[in-house]
């Protein structure tokens, strides 16, 4: 696995239950500012059944970027951790954003 993925995944593993972070914040914390899209691509390529808490990563507007069934799946996982998610996949970053 390349160093970028190692660092990105290490940061994502640190996001605590009941909190979220953004693609851009993950990239910045991993030492790759400006690589938000690459974080999204890396998460999109995860194998089925990955233990990485990918669902805790959302976009900078506080919304789930996925569509359809994938949006529903991410929404369910976040709600199971006590995070309030609107019908359109919006999360209150002021309340749920991870501040390491």
Curated annotation (Swiss-Prot):
Keywords: DNA damage, DNA-binding. One of its GO terms (biological process) is DNA repair. The record marks 37 as: Arg finger, required for nucleotide flipping. The keyword Transcription regulation does not apply. Changing residue 37 to A: Severely impairs ability to bind alkylated DNA. The record marks 23 as: Required for phosphate rotation/nucleotide flipping. GO terms for molecular function: catalytic activity; DNA binding. Changing residue 23 to A: Severely impairs ability to bind alkylated DNA. The keyword DNA-binding applies. It comes from the Bacteria. InterPro entries: ATL_DNA_repair, MethylDNA_cys_MeTrfase_DNA-bd, MethylDNA_cys_MeTrfase_DNAb, WH-like_DNA-bd_sf. Belongs to the MGMT family. ATL subfamily. Involved in DNA damage recognition. Binds DNA containing O(6)-methylguanine. Binds to the damaged base and flips the base out of the DNA duplex into an extrahelical conformation, which allows processing by repair proteins. This is DNA base-flipping protein. It comes from Vibrio parahaemolyticus serotype O3:K6 (strain AQ3810).
């Amino acid at each position: 696995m390349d160093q970028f993925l190692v660092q990105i995944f290490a940061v994502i593993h640190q996001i605590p239950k009941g909190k979220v972070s953004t693609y851009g914040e993950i990239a910045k914390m991993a030492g790759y500012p400006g690589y938000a899209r690459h974080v999204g691509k890396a998460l999109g390529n995860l194998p089925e059944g990955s233990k990485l808490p990918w669902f805790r990563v959302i976009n900078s507007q506080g919304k789930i970027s996925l569509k359809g069934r994938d949006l529903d799946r991410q929404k369910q996982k976040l709600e199971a951790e006590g995070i309030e998610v609107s019908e359109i996949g919006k999360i209150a970053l002021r309340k749920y954003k991870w501040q390491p």
